């Protein structure tokens, strides 16, 4: 089971679609005003009990094998940062939340992280190798896309 905690933005949207397409159970916990894209939610409907959208981070994290999070205010949203911090205050990935997950659950973050906001320092440090591996692997995937695009046919 994969879960996403935070803003129902591009990361959440991609994880929901990708996770469901590959047969995973996916849970997303977001505040009501920050839900994933309606088209993504329509896509998820046929998957029934393989998808959970909730405001309850505990329900989303329960028995999760991997937990994803992202910043609460992305680049270009600086003017909304305080409002978003207030809205997402209870949506932090921390050791207490991970206690609800599978015993060997992984934590992922697309970086850069705002430690103390969406993820605690302790949790980030404990899972830093996994988090940085994700960032490195994303670089290789991006390079492969560039090669494909530049190669033409």
What is each stretch, according to the model?
Residues 1-69:
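Glycine-rich phosphate/diphosphate-binding loop of Rossmann-like nucleotide-binding domains
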Residues 2, 26, 107-108, 145:
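Hydrophobic/aromatic residues located in beta-strands of well-ordered beta-sheets
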Residues 7, 85-86, 133:
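Conserved short-loop catalytic and cofactor-binding motifs
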Residues 10, 14, 36-39, 55, ...:
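Conserved active-site and cofactor/substrate-binding residues in soluble primary-metabolism enzymes
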Residues 14, 18-21, 43, 96, ...:
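Alpha-helical scaffold segments in soluble metabolic enzymes
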Residues 22-26, 102-104, 127:
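Short, surface-exposed connector motifs at secondary-structure boundaries
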Residues 45-121:
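Rossmann-like adenosine-cofactor binding region
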Residues 104-105, 111-153:
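Adenosine-phosphate binding glycine-rich loop
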């Amino acid at each position: 089971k994969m879960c996403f905690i935070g803003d129902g933005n591009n990361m959440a949207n991609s994880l929901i679609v990708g996770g469901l397409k590959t047969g995973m159970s996916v849970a997303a916990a977001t505040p009501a005003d920050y839900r994933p894209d309606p088209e993504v939610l329509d896509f998820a409907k046929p998957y029934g009990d393989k998808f959970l959208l909730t405001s309850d981070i505990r329900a989303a994290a329960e028995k999760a094998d991997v937990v994803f999070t992202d910043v609460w205010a992305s680049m270009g949203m600086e003017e909304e940062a305080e409002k978003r911090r207030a809205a997402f205050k209870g949506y932090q990935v921390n050791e207490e939340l991970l206690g609800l997950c599978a015993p060997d659950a992984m934590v992922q973050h697309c970086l850069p992280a705002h430690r103390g906001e969406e993820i605690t320092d302790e949790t980030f440090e404990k899972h830093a190798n996994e988090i940085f591996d994700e960032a490195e692997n994303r670089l290789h995937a991006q390079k492969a896309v560039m090669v494909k695009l530049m190669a033409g046919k």
